[in-house]
Amino acid sequence: MNSSRSVNPRPSFAPRALSLAIALLLGAPAFAANSGEAPKNFGLDVKITGESENDRDLGTAPGGTLNDIGIDLRPWAFGQWGDWSAYFMGQAVAATDTIETDTLQSDTDDGNNSRNDGREPDKSYLAAREFWVDYAGLTAYPGEHLRFGRQRLREDSGQWQDTNIEALNWSFETTLLNAHAGVAQRFSEYRTDLDELAPEDKDRTHVFGDISTQWAPHHRIGVRIHHADDSGHLRRPGEEVDNLDKTYTGQLTWLGIEATGDAYNYRSSMPLNYWASATWLTGDRDNLTTTTVDDRRIATGKQSGDVNAFGVDLGLRWNIDEQWKAGVGYARGSGGGKDGEEQFQQTGLESNRSNFTGTRSRVHRFGEAFRGELSNLQAATLFGSWQLREDYDASLVYHKFWRVDDDSDIGTSGINAALQPGEKDIGQELDLVVTKYFKQGLLPASMSQYVDEPSALIRFRGGLFKPGDAYGPGTDSTMHRAFVDFIWRF
């Protein structure tokens, strides 16, 4: 979208991030000067990714097609001094086009149709992925620690948290009791090509906590709470709106209860695994209302109201034998209601990737191609998986998607096409994820708790999406998104 409105350029935050990361690493010994020499742990992760995509617009707009390759280098350093430790991971990406080399940074969010290029990704960039210091001396429990800095917040389902973000996070993990509490806010992407935050991340603070217990061997039950304080500003009536402007603000609180039976443990020996979660979303939300004038979005006001919404996710997996597994899943996020009060949304920190198929490979819960958010969405899932020792695994997943309210929009997704009112059928998808693992044991033992993959692998992950009636006539009959990843950790 073109506009004559001038915008003051913002300086890149990447140099600040690198300076802060170096300060954290160099400052850690001062916290534990009497604890002895730090081990010298450093390395390099090499990732080569090929992406094929056609096309996310379903033929309703030009472009949206990719067939490109890139390399992603991630140098890291880790030091430990008694109860203190520090970690840094950088990133250097070069590609033939703006492809996705990182599952935590979706390439579906860009700065197109914006008044400036502050969020338009480049095909090559430098970044600081993680930089933190950690203290594990608050208690005598080995699974307790306090971490400060840009870090990966993650829980098993990937539906509450799975992202790199600036946070102060306390963790307490034992066999029978797990607990976490923290506060987080995104201040920068720490990339040389992105000077702007995504609009949903601007001026947004997260406060969260959870506690769970193992009430029987391999069976856990727990509760979660997450509060998001979104204090940003919406455009005034008459002002032009672009993709970098916020579309909603408010105070939202998620309250959830969950029960699992080795649901995300690919080594589980139980005959049946399960997961069940229910989440209530409450609070207040102001949604921006707009109209289109001469191909420009113009703010007309805001729609204010309370929020009373819910989401559920259920699943059952049968371990047929040591190699073969099969399962079903169902998820629903409410939608619609007066002034959108029943419109569920996720926390904004989710990836929706997990080991729900029972393999080491993490698969998107709502489709590798569709990549839906649990918002005005229901999804039925069938899957089968296979793994051979620690060397191979494969997952075949089928999804069927519907809207809950056929006159309301869904949340974010990997499809850039408008939905038609009055139609619920979003579509269906078939996913395939296949991985070959090799060269185990290259990483230092001290790093084993910070990585969740073997030292090297080759992986194919792809999805074929067939749109339903909700996308209307005249759209493409199919859309695909596929990746081939080669990863080697030195």
From Swiss-Prot:
<feature type="signal peptide">
    <location>
        <begin position="1"/>
        <end position="32"/>
    </location>
</feature>
<comment type="similarity">
    <text>Belongs to the AlgE family.</text>
</comment>
<dbReference type="InterPro" id="IPR025388">
    <property type="entry name" value="Alginate_export_dom"/>
</dbReference>
<feature type="compositionally biased region" description="Polar residues">
    <location>
        <begin position="102"/>
        <end position="115"/>
    </location>
</feature>
<dbReference type="Pfam" id="PF13372">
    <property type="entry name" value="Alginate_exp"/>
</dbReference>
<dbReference type="InterPro" id="IPR053728">
    <property type="entry name" value="Alginate_Permeability_Chnl"/>
</dbReference>
<dbReference type="GO" id="GO:0009279">
    <property type="term" value="C:cell outer membrane"/>
</dbReference>
<protein>
    <recommendedName>
        <fullName>Alginate production protein AlgE</fullName>
    </recommendedName>
</protein>
<comment type="function">
    <text>Has non-porin-like, channel-forming properties and probably functions as an alginate permeability pore.</text>
</comment>
<keyword id="KW-0732">Signal</keyword>
<keyword id="KW-0016">Alginate biosynthesis</keyword>
<feature type="region of interest" description="Disordered">
    <location>
        <begin position="331"/>
        <end position="355"/>
    </location>
</feature>
<dbReference type="GO" id="GO:0042121">
    <property type="term" value="P:alginic acid biosynthetic process"/>
</dbReference>
<keyword id="KW-0998">Cell outer membrane</keyword>
<feature type="compositionally biased region" description="Polar residues">
    <location>
        <begin position="343"/>
        <end position="355"/>
    </location>
</feature>
<feature type="region of interest" description="Disordered">
    <location>
        <begin position="102"/>
        <end position="121"/>
    </location>
</feature>
<keyword id="KW-0472">Membrane</keyword>
<comment type="pathway">
    <text>Glycan biosynthesis; alginate biosynthesis.</text>
</comment>
